[in-house]
């Protein structure tokens, strides 16, 4: 029986590399997968998942109004698994579509992304995945300052912490730092 998996972690926790690893494992056995990512993620290239260690792969971009269920249902070959990167940017509708892929098409879905933003609020996609997922797992990494478990994301601008602004600002290591709670409130900058 297929399940909806939500795997979350802070920045630099290896979420995308995990997607690429899972895809490779399925495909090594001749089992096709579908890799999708939010259309908002344009860090490297539109419609591409890319890890910080340099591995990359084409992906189907997901817009807020995309009918993911119909897209998967109408593929010429049923996938063995659907892998989603940057799931925090998904809309409520997108997440409910993913649940239908699992329940109605019996295709497992693994969604990877951030849980909370730089202000410590849940993203829309994360909120609905926490509500609907059958299995929820944390992908761990360490605080940049003290090596304790990182649970938050610190946004920086010109070397200074930022606690206000738009929820979504696409960026990488130059903008966001994985931190523990202590260093979120008192960063060593």
From Swiss-Prot:
Protein name per its UniProtKB record: Thymidine kinase
UniProt xrefs under InterPro entries: P-loop_NTPase (IPR027417), Thymidine_kinase (IPR001267), Thymidine_kinase_CS (IPR020633)
EC annotation from Swiss-Prot or TrEMBL: 2.7.1.21
Chief location of this protein within or outside the cell: cytoplasm
UniProt key word Zinc: yes
Catalytic activity line of the entry: thymidine + ATP = dTMP + ADP + H(+)
Assembly with partners or alone: Homotetramer.
HAMAP family referenced in this protein's UniProt entry, alphabetically: Thymidine_kinase (MF_00124)
GO BP terms: DNA biosynthetic process; thymidine metabolic process
Active site positions: 86 (proton acceptor)
Gene Ontology molecular function: ATP binding; thymidine kinase activity; zinc ion binding
GO CC terms, sorted: cytosol
Residues annotated as signal peptide: none
């Amino acid at each position: 029986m297929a399940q909806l998996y939500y795997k979350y972690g802070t920045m630099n926790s290896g979420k995308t590399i995990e997607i690429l690893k899972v895809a490779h494992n399925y495909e090594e056995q001749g089992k096709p997968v579908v890799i999708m990512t939010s259309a908002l993620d344009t860090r490297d290239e539109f419609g591409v998942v890319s890890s910080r260690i340099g591995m990359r792969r084409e992906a189907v971009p997901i817009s807020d109004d995309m009918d993911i269920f119909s897209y998967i249902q109408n593929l010429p070959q049923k996938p063995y698994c659907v892998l989603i990167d940057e799931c925090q940017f998904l809309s409520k509708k997108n997440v409910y579509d993913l649940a239908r892929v699992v329940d109605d098409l019996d295709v497992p879905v693994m969604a990877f992304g951030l849980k909370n933003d730089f202000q410590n609020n849940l993203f829309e996609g994360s909120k609905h995945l926490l509500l609907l997922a059958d299995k929820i797992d944390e992908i761990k990494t360490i605080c940049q300052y003290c090596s304790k478990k990182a649970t938050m994301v610190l946004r920086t601008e010109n070397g200074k912490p930022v606690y206000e602004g738009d929820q979504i600002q696409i960026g990488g290591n130059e903008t966001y730092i994985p931190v523990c709670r202590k260093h979120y409130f008192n960063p060593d900058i």
